[in-house]
């Protein structure tokens, strides 16, 4: 794979002031000698000249030269800074490919090469991709912590603890005659395993919060027809996306939108009003409402406070323990006496008076902004959970009467699952799967 040369537009297919075309591999400098009228630079040098095709000038550019491994990719690399028109940039890329000395890079292939060349580990590689795709401040900070290695230290600490236990077992197996070696029975080993499991549980608990950071907090707006769900969604996303009408059952399908609060991304779902109905299409919409409730992290149950005979929807009973449920009374502007609702979340979507709701949501999810050190993406969480399962298998073996020489097999599996987070893997398909999600040219 690393014996060929790759190229791609690193700055995206849009009109812009400056575009970047990246070439990496053993033929990078040779290609430039064919298409560049200007000085071939030394490593870490910038030179000025023309890109040409058989002396037909195409664009005046700046070229950054990186020889050897003194760059992100870890091999000979050239970056052409051209005028950023889409046509102009693609003409240069086509000219590079025309030399037959390079092929078009796959998505994420420059980062993959950086990983294979030992310039970055898998955590840092994924952090780069997360930085690129961050939509809100908390996502950006989480990705930056990953890139700086802050999260890695927590996982490395677990790896070291597993290695320590494996080492003790191996010494007992290989050198049983040594007087200064602690005799390792199941009774001695089990407390160490239990402590290890407690450490895994603590890390998984913290890591699971990362999903809310990376994927956004799925927020479902539910309630009876005409309670003000659509009005609230339009206020939150600052857009008239949901249809507002006095006719019950106007919203038939799930309407989606995003909003940012306190640096966190909330993904909103406005659902069909829930009520008893014989209308087939409306029934389908109500079924989708219940499906959205199941998927939500935050359930906002909107109730018309002005309605005397309110429909009793016991939606709280449908919420899981891991879901946040909030009952919100809307249409405060129609109330003569608000005393009944003094302990409730009372809003007026019509007049955009929702400050108390926003403050409540901020207070509930404030903990996500406080975890500045450890975050994990879905791949990393999966590996940590697989590691824990292997430790549980080791514990089961010991409790079933098997000796440490059996438990060590599962401990080594746990060790491997955690090491995979950093890219110590032999599975090429796994690497392809991870890096294929990256941008072209990265």
From Swiss-Prot:
Q: Which GO terms describe its molecular function?
A: GTP binding; GTPase activity; metal ion binding
What protein name does the entry list?
Answer: tRNA modification GTPase MnmE
Which gene carries the instructions for this protein? mnmE
* InterPro entries listed in its UniProt record: G_TrmE, GTP-bd, GTP-bd_TrmE_N, GTPase_MnmE, MnmE_dom2, MnmE_helical, P-loop_NTPase, Small_GTP-bd
Q: Which cofactor does it need?
A: K(+)
| Subcellular location field | Cytoplasm
Per UniProt, residues of the TrmE-type G domain are 216-366
Purpose:
Exhibits a very high intrinsic GTPase hydrolysis rate. Involved in the addition of a carboxymethylaminomethyl (cmnm) group at the wobble position (U34) of certain tRNAs, forming tRNA-cmnm(5)s(2)U34.
Give the GO biological process terms: tRNA methylation; tRNA wobble uridine modification
Which annotated residues bind Mg(2+)? 230, 251
Name the residues that bind GTP. 226-231, 245-251, 270-273
Cited HAMAP family: GTPase_MnmE
Task: Provide this UniProt record's keywords sorted from A to Z.
Answer: Cytoplasm, GTP-binding, Hydrolase, Magnesium, Metal-binding, Nucleotide-binding, Potassium, tRNA processing
Q: Which residues bind (6S)-5-formyl-5,6,7,8-tetrahydrofolate?
A: 22, 79, 119, 442
Q: How is the cofactor bound?
A: Binds 1 potassium ion per subunit.
The enzyme's E.C. designation: 3.6.-.-
Q: What is the lineage of its organism?
A: Bacteria, Bacillati, Mycoplasmatota, Mycoplasmoidales, Metamycoplasmataceae
What organism is this sequence from?
Mesomycoplasma hyopneumoniae (strain 7448) (Mycoplasma hyopneumoniae)
Please give the Pfam families that the UniProt record associates with this protein. MMR_HSR1, MnmE_helical, TrmE_N
Quote the record's binding site residues for K(+).
226, 245, 247, 250
Q: What does the subunit section of this Swiss-Prot or TrEMBL entry state?
A: Homodimer. Heterotetramer of two MnmE and two MnmG subunits.
């Amino acid at each position: 794979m690393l014996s060929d040369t790759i190229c791609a537009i690193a700055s995206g297919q849009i009109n812009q002031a400056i575009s970047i075309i990246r070439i990496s591999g053993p033929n990078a400098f040779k290609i430039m000698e064919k298409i560049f009228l200007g000085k071939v630079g030394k490593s870490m040098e910038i030179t000025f000249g023309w890109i040409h095709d058989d002396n037909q000038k195409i664009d005046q550019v700046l070229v950054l030269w990186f020889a050897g491994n003194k760059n992100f990719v870890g091999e000979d690399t050239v970056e052409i800074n051209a005028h950023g028109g889409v046509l102009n940039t693609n003409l240069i890329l086509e000219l590079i490919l025309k030399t037959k000395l390079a092929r078009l890079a796959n998505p994420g292939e420059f980062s993959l090469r950086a990983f294979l060349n030992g310039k970055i580990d898998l955590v840092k590689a994924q952090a780069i991709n997360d930085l690129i795709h961050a939509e809100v401040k908390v996502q950006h900070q989480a990705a930056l912590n990953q890139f700086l290695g802050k999260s890695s230290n927590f996982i490395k600490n677990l790896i070291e603890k597993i290695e320590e236990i494996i080492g003790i077992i191996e010494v007992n197996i290989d050198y049983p005659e040594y007087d200064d070696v602690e005799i390792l029975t199941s009774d001695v080993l089990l407390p160490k395993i239990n402590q290890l499991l407690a450490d895994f549980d603590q890390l998984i608990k913290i890591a699971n919060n990362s999903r809310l950071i990376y994927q956004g907090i799925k927020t479902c707006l539910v309630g009876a027809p005409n309670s003000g769900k659509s009005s609230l969604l339009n206020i939150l996303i600052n857009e008239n996306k949901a249809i507002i009408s006095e006719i019950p059952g106007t919203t038939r399908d799930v309407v989606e939108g995003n909003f940012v609060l306190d640096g966190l991304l909330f993904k909103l779902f406005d659902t069909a009003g829930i009520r008893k109905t014989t209308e087939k299409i409306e029934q389908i919409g109500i079924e989708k409402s219940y499906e959205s409730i199941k998927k939500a992290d935050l359930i906002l149950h909107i109730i018309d406070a002005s309605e005397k005979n309110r429909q009793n929807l016991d939606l709280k009973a449908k919420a899981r323990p891991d879901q946040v449920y909030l009952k919100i009374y809307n249409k405060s502007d129609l109330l003569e006496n608000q005393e009944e609702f003094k302990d409730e979340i009372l809003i007026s979507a019509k007049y955009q008076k929702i400050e108390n709701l926003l403050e409540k949501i901020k207070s509930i999810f404030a903990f996500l902004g406080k975890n500045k050190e450890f975050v994990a993406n879905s791949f990393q969480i999966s590996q940590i959970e697989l590691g824990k399962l292997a430790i549980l298998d080791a514990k089961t073996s010991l409790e079933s009467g098997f000796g440490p020489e059996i438990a060590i097999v599962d401990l080594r599996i746990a060790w491997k699952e955690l090491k995979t987070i950093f890219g110590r893997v032999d599975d090429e398909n796994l690497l392809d799967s991870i890096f294929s999600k990256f941008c072209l040219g990265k």
